[in-house]
Amino acid sequence: MNKYLVTSLLVFSLLLGTAACQGQASPTNSVLALEEHPLEGPPDPDTGIFLPVGTSQEAVLAQHQAERQRSVANYVEFSDQAGGPVMASRGSGETLSAVLLTSENDPPRQIVELHKGDQVVFSVDAGLPSPALPLQSLWSYDGHWVLEILYSEDEIWQGRIYRDGQLLNDTENYLDAFGFQLLGGKPFYFYQREDGLGYYYDGQENPLPYQEILHYGCCSASTLNPQPAENMVAFYAHTGDDWYYVELGNFSED
């Protein structure tokens, strides 16, 4: 065969291979794996039992049990010295704490103060007292801080997320924003707009096919709130009467 023809065929084959590779859809780092388990009905907050269709609760929970146990939930402690409930920051950034106080000028309104040592670096109105505490999440990472509060009024029950003092609900037009955490070391949270629910991860928004994600439940209902872990989050959701237990995450890190 003519050597020029061989060379031409080789180049053509390489070009075809390159084009084929470029045409393949590969998952991006900003899209997480979603594992959805339909339920026979709503989960029981008192017992923690849910009934998945066609399988058992034990089998579903066994899939990512080790990962789910690597919790990154924020916890609240009651401090007489601080004058109210306190939440310490998570993450690799500077150590911060959020303190819930009653307004001296307008009780019983609540205020959340963000402290760096003895210095107050941020303060925000947290609404009126409710069965659930306003302090929901606090992270410090990569030169940023993020504070999530539950804001409560007579007609308002809203998750609000502040990033470096900026309210994301306003800048991103969210009706609700909740469940902030670092997932795989990257910022993650749920949001709701008028057109539906979704999640933000690593700079990208992704829609979710649900009417509601259970969150901010108190007392026994708190067992149905999202469960954040290092590389995933587990939650309950529904659309109408169709209920789901969902695990969303970067399961390659299991």
Labelled PLM ranges:
Residues 22-24:
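Bacterial signal peptide processing site
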Residues 1-8:
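Bacterial N-terminal signal peptides that target proteins for export
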Residues 27-254:
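Non-catalytic tandem-repeat scaffold regions and their flanking low-complexity/translocation tails
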